[in-house]
């Protein structure tokens, strides 16, 4: 019985389609992983420029469903076909694999004003379901770096999408290259129920 504040079709599309989110990020200058455009034909011309390792994921699934890590062409082709088989959308994301800690960053929005609410570290539990996280905590030594490097561009993403009221969040990785990259956004309360 939680409210849905999404009054913009664009906001809903960006929050539920990872490809549209990435396009909007690129438009406003928010950092995202390098990606590769592939079609179901998986032609030699498409595959020859891919630099491994990559991540393959459907644009319309959450909780890491359909996501695969690929070190070579054979793994990429199999992962692409798998992601395509479980997706309702013909677009599949193939992007550079990022390595580093993951964060969920929550914002509160009121009358178009956007404020960072909390910055939480996510630690997945090896050996458990792929969409299971064991620990989420709000204290992080990386908050200042995030604010300095990414916070303003995330606010631009929300504004450009038409997010004006409610709660929104982004998931991000601090890659081993020392920079944050945005993964996806939500325009709703998060599933981990940290608002309770």
What are these regions (language model features)?
Residues 8, 58-62, 189:
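Short, histidine-centered active-site or binding-site loop motifs used for metal coordination
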């Amino acid at each position: 019985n939680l409210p849905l504040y999404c009054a913009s079709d664009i906001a809903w599309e960006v929050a539920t389609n990872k490809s549209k989110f990435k396009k909007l990020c690129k438009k406003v200058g928010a950092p995202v992983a390098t990606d590769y455009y592939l079609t179901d034909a998986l032609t030699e011309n498409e595959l020859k420029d891919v630099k491994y390792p990559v991540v393959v994921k459907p644009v319309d699934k959450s909780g890491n469903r359909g996501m695969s890590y690929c070190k070579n062409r054979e793994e990429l082709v199999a992962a692409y076909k798998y992601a395509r088989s479980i997706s309702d959308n013909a677009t599949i994301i193939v992007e550079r694999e990022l390595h580093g800690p993951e964060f969920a960053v929550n914002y509160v929005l009121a009358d178009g004003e956007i404020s960072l609410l909390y910055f939480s570290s996510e630690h997945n539990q090896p050996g458990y379901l792929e969409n299971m996280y064991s620990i989420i905590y709000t204290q992080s030594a990386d908050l200042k770096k995030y604010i300095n490097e990414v916070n303003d561009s995330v606010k631009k993403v929300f504004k450009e999408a038409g997010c004006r009221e409610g709660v929104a969040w982004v998931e991000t990785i601090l890659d081993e290259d020392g920079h944050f990259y945005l993964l996806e956004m939500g325009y709703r309360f998060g599933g981990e129920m940290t608002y309770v």
